[in-house]
Swiss-Prot record:
Residue windows of the Sequence repeats: 25-30, 31-36, 37-42, 43-48, 49-54, 55-60, 61-66, 67-72
UniProt catalytic activity: choline(out) = choline(in); ethanolamine(in) = ethanolamine(out); heme b(in) = heme b(out)
Native source species: Homo sapiens (Human)
Modified residues (Phosphoserine): S515
SUPFAM superfamilies reported for this sequence: MFS general substrate transporter (SSF103473)
Positions of region (Disordered): 1-70, 500-526
Biased composition (Low complexity): 25-56
Annotated protein name in UniProt: Choline/ethanolamine transporter FLVCR2
């Protein structure tokens, strides 16, 4: 056994009672747990460390049945599984593959316009279809996640991603643009099975001191795919006039992504499991105990929309992520506008934005695990995103590409670094509601604003230039920063973990006092 603070590495099959683990003051659980009369723990009942009471007996609200058929074998044991990093890395990789396919057309927008003989708006829709399909499919897929679990959703998403990649190989003629649209639509459906999973994987597989880092790693893959999507297509597909030669270069890109998608599907089948044997945190253990097999899915959504803090986060997250989607889709067009013939550098600027954002995401995830300052960190990152966007807006047309690289990278560090922050903040604000539902609603907001911003900014750029188009985004980022300031730091998951620890310590103290009293009486009697 390897002690990891509040968790233990699962190195053998011998369970370790929760009472044997160290208390972590940074760990958190839903505030209603301590005040609900049927949830509070009776301090007069002593629980021996070697036979910890089942959490369903300690924290079972009335009317909720413990899902013994779906939860881990013993909820009184808190352990993390060694498989957890393999699971999150495989997920991160196939998420990367899917996001690459999202941006591979937009990063060389002008080349695909020439090859297929279509308008820039038609190529933009190959990106926006990802956003459009997500909106109606999110709630059904979130329901499937609750009904069938992580493994089924992972297999479905990876399989659809692989299928879409191979369908695109049938579109290597200029008149076959509809085929590439079909392939992209299949990949966009796969994305619905991917985007809502990072926070769920982090909660189900990782300990309380690892969840933010794990969520950042899961989101990291999506951002890496976008980065590669900016870098690789301009290199593999040069801007040439001969369409036959262009088809050859496009086929190389499509074959590579098809092979990678197939390999990742095989890895998902081998590596991805539904859940670890034991819950990795006290909050997750209690979440199993609080879960009802008859819980209303629509009721959960209704409760989320009654949570004002979460509603504000949904709006602000959508504004930030939507601005990122619009910038990513239109970046090639904006750079070529001021720097003709610089398709490769346009891709490199996109790469710089995303790589900087990946660094920001990892740093923010580590910082959250240590500080738990969700509201403060989110607000600071949002304000810096606005500052970065303003600087980028007024330096894009200066005629110096190296300046654009610096300002775009600074903006990306905060803009894409914000994305995992939003997921984790949402889980804190909505615990013990499903992470899949909360993160899914965030993503719906992002897709809606992404479509609106992409179409609007594209029209503004075509009619008035890049600066007015970017100022348009700055206005909405200002609104998002202002609304973020009104979100209260109601960290329910943190409170729940803390209260569970306090109740446990109180139990042990009562047990200790109870065991000492008979001894004292016996000595007096003698």
């Amino acid at each position: 056994m390897v002690n990891e603070g509040p968790n233990q590495e699962e190195s053998d099959d011998t369970p370790v009672p929760e009472s044997a683990l160290q208390a972590d003051p940074s760990v958190s659980v839903h505030p209603s747990v301590s005040v609900h009369p049927s949830v509070s723990i009776n301090p007069s009942v002593s629980v021996h460390p070697s036979s910890s009471a089942h959490p369903s007996a300690l924290a079972q609200p009335s009317g909720l049945a413990h899902p013994s058929s779906s939860g881990p074998e013993d909820l009184s044991v808190i352990k993390v599984s060694r498989r957890r990093w393999a699971v999150v890395l495989v997920f991160s990789c196939y998420s990367m593959c899917n996001s690459f396919q999202w941006i591979q057309y937009g990063s060389i927008n002008n080349i695909f316009m020439h090859f297929y003989g279509v308008s820039a708006f038609a190529i933009d829709w190959l990106s926006m279809c990802y956003m459009l399909t997500y909106i109606p499919l999110l709630l059904p897929v979130a329901w499937l996640l609750e009904k069938f679990g992580l493994r089924t959703i992972a297999l479905t998403g990876s399989a659809l991603n692989c299928l879409g990649a191979w369908v695109k190989l049938g579109s290597l003629k200029p008149h076959l643009f509809p085929v590439t649209v079909v392939g992209q639509l299949i990949c966009s459906v796969a994305q619905v099975f991917i985007l809502g999973m990072p926070s769920r994987i982090a909660s189900v597989w990782f300990g309380a001191n690892e969840v933010s880092t794990a969520c950042s790693v899961a989101v990291f893959g999506n951002q890496l795919g976008i980065a590669i999507g900016f870098l690789v297509p301009p290199v593999l597909v040069p801007n040439i006039e001969d369409r036959d030669e262009l088809a050859y270069h496009i086929s190389i890109m499509f074959y590579i992504i098809g092979g990678v998608a197939t390999l990742l599907l095989i890895l998902v089948i081998i590596v991805f499991k539904e859940k670890p044997k034991y819950p990795p945190s006290r909050a997750q253990s209690l979440s199993y105990a609080l879960t009802s097999p008859d819980a209303s899915y629509l009721g959960s959504i209704a409760r989320l929309f009654k949570n004002l803090n979460f509603v504000l986060l949904v709006i602000t997250y959508g504004l930030n992520a939507g601005a990122f989607y619009a910038l990513s889709t239109l970046l090639n067009r904006m750079v070529i506008w001021h720097y003709p013939g610089e398709e490769v550098n346009a891709g490199r600027i996109g790469l710089t934005i995303v790589i900087a954002g990946m660094l920001g995401a990892v740093i923010s995830g580590i910082w959250l695990d240590r500080s738990k300052t969700y509201k403060e960190t989110t607000l600071v990152v949002y304000i810096m995103t606005l500052v970065g966007m303003v600087v980028y807006t007024f330096t894009l047309n200066l005629g110096h590409l190296w300046v654009v690289f610096i300002t775009a990278g600074t903006m990306g560090f905060f803009m894409t670094g914000y994305l995992p922050l939003g997921f984790e903040f949402a889980v804190e604000l909505t615990y013990p509601e499903s992470e899949g539902i909360s993160s899914g609603l965030l993503n719906i907001s992002a897709q809606v604003f992404g479509i609106i911003f992409t179409i609007s900014q594209g029209q503004i750029i075509d009619n008035y230039g890049t600066k007015p188009g970017n100022i348009f985004l700055c206005v909405f980022l200002t609104l998002g920063a202002a609304l973020t300031a009104f979100i209260k730091a109601d960290l329910r998951r943190q409170k729940a973990n803390k209260e569970t620890l306090e109740n446990k310590l109180q139990e042990e103290e009562e047990e200790s006092n109870t065991s000492k009293v008979p001894t004292a009486v016996s000595e007096d009697h003698l």
